[in-house]
Amino acid sequence: MKKIIKVFILLLACFFVSCSSSNIEDSESENIVATEKKQRSKKIKPIKYNEEEYEKAYNQRNYSTCLGMMLYKTRKKADIRDNLDLAMLYFITGEYAQASAVFEKTDAQMFDTLTKSITKSIGKAIVNENLKEYTGNVYEYLLVNTMNSLCYYLQGDLNSAVNQLTKLSDVKLPEYRRLYGEVLVKNGLDPSAREKLDEDAKSLSAYNIDSSVFTADLPKKPTEKDVYKESSLARYLSLILRQADGDKSQIDSDSIVLKSLVKDFDSVDSAIPSGKGRVNVLALAGLIGKQTAKEVYFPSKSTYFYVPTGNSSYRLLPVQFKFVYPSYAGKSTVSGVDVVLNNVGTKSAVIIENFNANLEKSVKLRARKEYAASMNRSITKKVSGIVAGIASINASYEGLKMLSGRSIAYTLASIAFDALCSSTAAGLSAIDLTETADIRQGEFFPETVNAAGFTVPAGLYKGKVVYRFSDGSVVEKPFETEVKEGKPSLVVSSCIK
């Protein structure tokens, strides 16, 4: 009999691996999940990190291999960027305890670096090289707590899940708004940076280069609409988890904010009629898109400005300018998500959080300033290179003239002079290789988080989440949950592909 029970528990645990589902009040089944996950985590071993193999595994959606390589990469030291991916890889592979531990660490890292450097990194980035330390995109700063709340919930720890949402609403959001409130949408540049640009513009005009053309492709100024201010997913979870915890103090405020953020949100989610219960289904679908580097060349990628090297050498030095900034033009891979509750009905899930849209907003906030920063760096380097190059070429030419009449020596010096001119031009072109856009981001967030709900009598319910993708593929994930009178249940399902 004991063997039968053990087999049954193992099968039940395996079911939860494929599609996490739980009733908020029933922690026993979640304890089974946590135990099973802990046992599985021992089998995941670090795999020697290889960038090419890692990218291949990413493209194939081989998350176990990605996790193994990320474990190897972060075994000694992990920055925010790597920790974001490590936490989400743990989440995707069902290792919720490990994911939560890494999210906690990442949260502390982001809070420390962001609160100390946000004004410098955004307001004064134009006079500095690209920051080496990654502080996270704005939505990542807030959603790290939201995802951690989900991790705690999936381990059956409702109290810690709610605490993450409280930390977000009471501590991080006010601090975030204070720091970001004015900085992000300013059009003006740091005064010292503007002075430097004006100085460089004068230097370029001496070489008959009109730097005003460089602003022709300046990205649009961000607006208030581009500022990520709230996590609708956090509000949704707060609405359900606090209600399950017996806390109804924020139901009205959460409902109002959520309705303003998600127009199609069903207001019935905030209230459970007498004698009924609620099945809430949260579905994580797809994989977030990636930023790309936008490169702009002046005069163009195939043409140059020509700078005279002086009256003595009569050479023209080809000069080209390259500026970079982050760009995003990702396409949705998720066509839709439907939730089927057996013997009850089918509903199309509403997008609660769109990570692609979050990423696009983040790019719009940064693009203009990062273009200006790139312009400053590139011009400064090129002007320095031009000045040094002209000085070397003219000095070499004066030496060449002194050898006039000495056929062999003059011939050798002429060859050396031509080589110097060529290498100077090549050196100026090589400067462009150092100019790269900062397109770092967490790569394993879902594309969308979708939600649907059913008001039903108490009882056991079965159903499935149907994921439809733009490539025509359809994936179904079954679930089972218990509904108690007056209480919400939350099913968490995912198909990250």
Residue ranges and their predicted role:
Residues 20-23:
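Bacterial signal peptide processing site
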Residues 397-497:
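C-terminal soluble interaction/assembly domains
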Residues 15-18:
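C-terminal motif of bacterial Sec signal peptides marking the signal peptidase cleavage site
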Residues 56, 89-90, 151, 241:
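Residue-level signature for tetratricopeptide repeat
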